Amino acid sequence: MSVRRFLVWILALTVGAAPVMADRLKDLSRIKGVRNNQLVGYGLVVGLDGTGDKAPFTNQTFRNMMNQFGITLPDGVNPKLANVAAVTVSATLPAFAKAGQELDITVSSIGNADSLRGGTLLMTPLKGADGQVYAMAQGSLVVGGFGAQGQDGSRITVNVPSVGRIPNGATIEREVESPFNRGDTITFNLLRSDFTTARRVVEAINGRLGPDMAYAHDATSISVRAPRDPSQRVSFLSILENIEVDPAQEAARVVINSRTGTIVVGQNVKVSPAAITHGNLTVTIQENPEVVQPNPLAQGDTAVQQNTQIAVTEDPARMFQFGPATTLNEIVQAVNQVGAAPGDVMAVLEALKQAGALRAELIVI
């Protein structure tokens, strides 16, 4: 690609049309090949105030470390390592990270350590999925939680004291080669696959760069012809990713989390005409311990027996009706008027789906 044509592209992109209420391409997609990589390692945290673990693999790791320093422990000696904990160290290696840069790391106990507060992580290699070492970690931990325990076994714990972080605790030793500068095209992968959004992305790019500059492979991938020169490609991409696109509306979905009672209803959810009634059956069980004394002249011991009372109450069933093409606002108003609990709403939505009246995808997580 010539420099003249590249400058014409830059001028066309910077002039552009008037801004609209839309999302930037960088917010809707990710560039193919530009990704993070996960790193993990195994190491020791020392300097704990008696809150270390007593796992056998901690002693083995400690022996191996001593051997590396030329110190051999006699056979049969089992050191009491109350101040040492075996941990896993994890980090995320960003795209284009260079050797010498630093990473934040997370340190997590894998034994029965009570707390990592006040500990120091010894030098730990961090490896990638290919088994190669990409960073070295070491430093003092920052732990947000704490715990305390009494001699009678009672204890209190705030947050999670067995996990800590070390800001800038790892130094990158090896870089990951990126395919960013290879080939004649740059491919964007949409975060949410949608044929309509993919078509609009292609139209927005071609409208700014010219016809046939961008094309869609499927509902996820869109390729754009780009200059080969790395400096031109960076400038080209910095403007390309700021092109605004009006994404398609999401498909109608209702997401239910049965564990937390959370219900999320999408904007395009509608309900066909239906009448619903749902009653509540409440069972209450009360356990009242009572002390039973033996007769004055009888031989026996004082005992405690349970006095159980069971009560069943059924609230009157409420009926409400959905008209044709009922919208999200109408659904929310109907549910609020009858005072339905999240569990009741889940049951109603599942019944509507089975009856074919819920015109949306029902997802239970």
From Swiss-Prot:
Lineage top rank: taxon: Bacteria
Keyword Oxidoreductase assigned: no
Pfam families, sorted: FlgI
Database matches in InterPro entries: Flag_FlgI (IPR001782)
Annotated compartments: Periplasm; Bacterial flagellum basal body
GO MF term (any one): structural molecule activity
Main location: periplasm
Key words of the record: Bacterial flagellum, Periplasm, Signal
GO cellular component: bacterial-type flagellum basal body, distal rod, P ring; outer membrane-bounded periplasmic space
GO BP annotations listed: bacterial-type flagellum-dependent cell motility
Signal peptide: 1-22
Key word Cell inner membrane present: no
Job description of the protein: Assembles around the rod to form the L-ring and probably protects the motor/basal body from shearing forces during rotation.
UniProt similarity note: Belongs to the FlgI family.
Subunit structure: The basal body constitutes a major portion of the flagellar organelle and consists of four rings (L,P,S, and M) mounted on a central rod.
Protein name: Flagellar P-ring protein
Organism, scientific name: Marinobacter nauticus (strain ATCC 700491 / DSM 11845 / VT8) (Marinobacter aquaeolei)
